[in-house]
């Protein structure tokens, strides 16, 4: 009897097993991908995965600047990094869950349809392009314009934008709407989301050719990133991404993300 009572008391006093937690690296001010209010589509996808895992979501908020991966995922401060280009060297990546492209953004009323990187009209236009820095690590459209001698009529907009304001990457799309530039070359998910909110109707068309000078693609597959020593987690996330493929597709469409067939 004493043994039974001791076992019963132990059970009654036991605390529940720790619930599983999915810790996510994310930028707190980077719509349409993520923000601290969890309004981005990456936030929503993470919530889908966590629900499937029976886990709660915890965020490590860190502005996506140089050193982002080194200071977050590689320091084991978080488990996954959503929205990373498939196959990057610094992390292990899952199979992609969407594929998008850089796009030309112009005012619909200007009739700038059918542009390509080699279109002679570009020489006469004010062009906006997303920039990273001056050390050779710029965006593919920036390199493509430079290779064609399109420099004097190009205005750079920092990829990260002014972090002191909400939605810092939106500045380049707003510049098109305001007429500060005639056309801009913008990463599709950013362009689609902010163009959908613009009071000025905007036209979006994929940048072509999609591969410039062999090393500058305009189309990217997007994956989740995990540490290389977490192959089991990577497989688990891949399985969940596959199970929720239809929901993810609908979610991306609701955020106006341009999709490219694989």
Model-identified regions with their sequence ranges:
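Ligand-binding clefts/hinges and TM-proximal coupling segments of bilobed small-molecule sensing domains
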Residues: 56, 133-160, 235-262
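Bacterial N-terminal signal peptides
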Residues: 6-13
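Flexible hinge/capping segments at coil-to-helix
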Residues: 107-132, 143
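Periplasmic-binding protein-like
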Residues: 27-30, 99-102, 111, 156, ...
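Short helix-loop capping/hinge motifs at secondary-structure junctions, enriched
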Residues: 109-117, 134-135, 151, 229-234
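A ligand-binding cleft/hinge motif common to bilobed small-molecule-binding domains
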Residues: 67-68, 74, 82-92, 177-216
């Amino acid at each position: 009897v004493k043994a039974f009572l001791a076992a019963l008391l132990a059970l009654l006093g036991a605390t529940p097993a720790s619930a599983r937690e999915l810790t996510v690296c994310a930028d707190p001010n980077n719509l349409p991908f993520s923000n601290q209010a969890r309004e981005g589509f990456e936030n929503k996808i993470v919530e889908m995965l966590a629900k499937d895992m029976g886990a709660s979501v915890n965020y490590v908020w860190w502005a996506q600047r140089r050193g982002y991966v080194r200071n977050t995922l590689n320091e084991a401060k978080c488990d996954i990094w959503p929205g990373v280009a498939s196959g990057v060297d610094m992390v292990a990546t899952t199979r992609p869950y969407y594929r998008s492209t850089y796009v030309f953004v112009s005012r619909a009323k200007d009739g700038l349809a059918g542009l390509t990187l080699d279109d002679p009209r570009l020489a006469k236009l004010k062009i906006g392009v997303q920039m990273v820095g001056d050390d050779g690590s710029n965006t593919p459209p920036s390199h493509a314009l430079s290779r064609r001698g399109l420099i004097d009529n190009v205005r750079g907009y920092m990829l990260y934008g002014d972090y002191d304001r909400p939605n810092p990457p939106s500045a380049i799309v707003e510049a098109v709407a305001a007429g500060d530039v005639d056309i801009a070359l913008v990463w599709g998910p950013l362009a689609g989301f902010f163009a959908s909110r613009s009071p000025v109707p905007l036209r979006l068309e994929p940048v072509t050719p999609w591969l410039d000078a062999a090393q500058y693609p305009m189309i990217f597959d997007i994956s989740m990133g995990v540490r290389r020593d977490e192959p089991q987690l990577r497989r688990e996330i891949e399985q969940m991404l596959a199970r929720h493929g239809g929901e993810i597709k609908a979610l991306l469409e609701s955020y106006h993300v341009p999709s490219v067939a694989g």
